[in-house]
Regions:
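A short alpha-helical cap/connector motif
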Residues: 1-151, 155-200
Length: 200
């Protein structure tokens, strides 16, 4: 995928992101992939979910970008001073802290049993292979018909085939991968994506 369009096209995610609070545009260069994917859902997305809150920089980005969506932020660290105060009391932001987002009981109780469907789900959690596999098994179940699942910061190229084996058969045709290591600082700048969007 060519990313040269960034040089000439205004990128709303780039405009909105605070590079001091998120490394998606600095260390990793993910926004060049995300903009064409997410711009299709900018107005229509109703639920966006990310595992891995840290300071809340990306949660704030999704809140500002998807104006009509509820943003779900999950983290196994308890809520603490690292999370920016201005995202804690927003009506469209729901934070789940001190929990295991990869636990099947938590997932079922919090999302599946409530019938919540997500337009976009992202895993920016501990970056372990086992948690990534669990993320696919669990959160692919709550994607909308044209939903997108993204796993960030994949440590090894060999993991991509392992992760694809976790994808339900009916979703395997939608798998995309991006190796951005040549333009990024971090050597784990690899993305695994299930893109059910109708426009590709």
């Amino acid at each position: 995928m060519k990313l040269s369009w960034l040089k000439t096209t205004k990128n709303r995610l780039v405009d909105l992101i605070n590079d001091n609070l998120s490394d998606k545009n600095t260390m990793h260069k993910y926004l060049g992939v995300y903009e064409p994917l997410m711009s299709r859902k900018k107005e229509t997305a109703r639920n966006v979910l990310e595992v891995g809150i840290w300071t809340g920089g990306s949660i704030r980005l999704w809140y500002d970008y998807f104006k009509n969506a509820t943003i779900h932020g999950l983290d196994w660290f308890p809520e603490n001073i690292n999370i920016q105060a201005d995202i804690k009391n927003k009506q469209r932001i729901k934070l789940y802290t001190g929990i295991d987002a990869y636990n099947e009981d938590f997932f079922k109780r919090t999302f599946l049993d409530k019938g919540i469907k997500c337009d976009i789900v992202l895993d920016d959690g501990p970056h372990f292979l086992e948690t990534m596999k669990a993320f696919i098994r669990l959160y692919s179940q709550i994607l909308t018909d044209d939903g997108i699942l993204i796993i960030e910061d994949i440590e090894e190229l060999e993991w991509l085939d392992i992760l694809k084996n976790e994808v339900p058969d009916n979703l395997k045709q939608y798998v995309k991968t991006f190796d951005l290591r040549s333009i990024s600082i971090h050597q784990n700048s690899i993305l695994f994506i299930i893109d059910k969007s109708k426009t590709n």
